[in-house]
Amino acid sequence: MASCLHNLSEYDASLMPCKDKVKNQRYAIAVADWNSNVTYPLLEGAMQALCENGAEHVDVVHVPGAFELTYAARKFQEAHRYDAIIVLGCVIQGDTPHFDYVCGGTTQGIAALNARVGMPPVIFGLLTVN
């Protein structure tokens, strides 16, 4: 859990796979354009972390919002070209139940994709904030 004493954005590079392995792997990132003031910096950070650790093959697709992340991730899985998929989005709570529907649907969708046998993992990067 993140706190003022533990920043989850920091990581120990020695725990990362060797750069030779990462160099030969393919990654895909799906990023939501909604709340781009949050999601685009998330994309920049993900790209920076991947590149710093040797990744050379990263494909990025933009989707309208968080709900479409599941569709993009499934298409990446079905392409059978990627070793890992990352989804990035941000849903900000408002005064309607829309927040709950989008967050719940996206979470369940990504969880279902991760349960598929023989498919690459989908890393869940959806911020759900007040």
What are these regions (language model features)?
Residues 2-5, 25, 106-130:
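C-terminal binding/interaction regions
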Residues 17-62:
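Glycine-rich phosphate/diphosphate-binding loop of Rossmann-like nucleotide-binding domains
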Residues 1-23:
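N-terminal amphipathic/basic leader segments beginning at the initiator methionine
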Residues 33-34, 63, 90-91, 126-130:
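Short, ordered loop/turn segments at secondary-structure junctions
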Residues 52-80:
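Active-site rim loops that border cofactor/substrate pockets in soluble metabolic enzymes
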Residues 72-110, 114:
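Glycine-rich phosphate-binding loop
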